[in-house]
Design a protein with these regions (language model features):
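Membrane-proximal intracellular helices of multi-pass ion channels
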Residues: 1-196
């Protein structure tokens, strides 16, 4: 399980460089860029966030920044207007929020099911339940467009890799900082198939 206080909570790179890397990491996460700011560290060369796969603060914070950046500026405009002007959400924003939550849930559950007993190096099979849940959430969010990873992707099961490709293809929202065909485009395709 997650310890409450440990030495890894202290800056890995020292205070000044650590704050700089944290700032860049935050921007990279919000922009769904996935740049490896760690480089060659004690965790290995170009390891993304695999060294933090047992640190819920890093994974949840990075994951939520990815989600926020992936919603798109139209949705954020509606959220701001909802709280400041009490205006209603547009249809686009309603679809984006609902499908983002749905894709995160589907991705998280799929990752848990497909990787639960995978004990390959860097996978979640040997993790505790809280670590598995946080890692599955993070991978579900990150694989859609950001490119960060907290597990060794080469050791995932083939089913997880296929699911990753589907999530990557869908991507994030229109007007967002992420990629993919966009969630709303996927929604239009699905609705048009089932409407006939």
């Amino acid at each position: 399980s997650f310890p409450t206080r440990r030495s890894s909570d202290l800056p890995l790179f020292g205070w000044a460089p650590g704050i700089g890397r944290a700032f860049f990491q935050s921007i990279s996460a919000f922009c769904n860029a996935g740049f490896d700011v760690l480089g060659d560290t004690q965790f290995g060369p170009f390891c993304s966030l695999t060294g933090f796969n047992n640190n819920p603060v890093v994974l949840i914070t990075t994951g939520m920044l990815i989600v926020f950046g992936g919603l798109g500026f139209i949705v954020w405009g509606d959220i701001i207007n909802f709280f400041t002007k009490k205006s209603e959400f547009r249809t686009h924003s309603k679809i984006m929020i609902k499908l983002t939550v749905l894709l995160i849930l589907i991705g998280t559950i799929s990752f848990l099911v497909f990787e639960w007993s995978n004990t390959s190096d860097g996978s979640i099979g040997t993790m505790s339940l809280p670590e598995k849940l946080v890692t599955a959430f993070f991978e579900s969010v990150s694989l859609r467009t950001a490119g960060f990873s907290s597990v060794n992707l080469s050791n995932l099961t083939d089913t997880s890799k296929a699911m990753s490709c589907i999530l990557m293809f869908i991507g994030t929202g229109s007007g967002s900082t992420g990629g993919g065909i966009k969630i709303t485009t996927m929604a239009v395709l699905v609705f048009s198939v089932f409407s006939e």
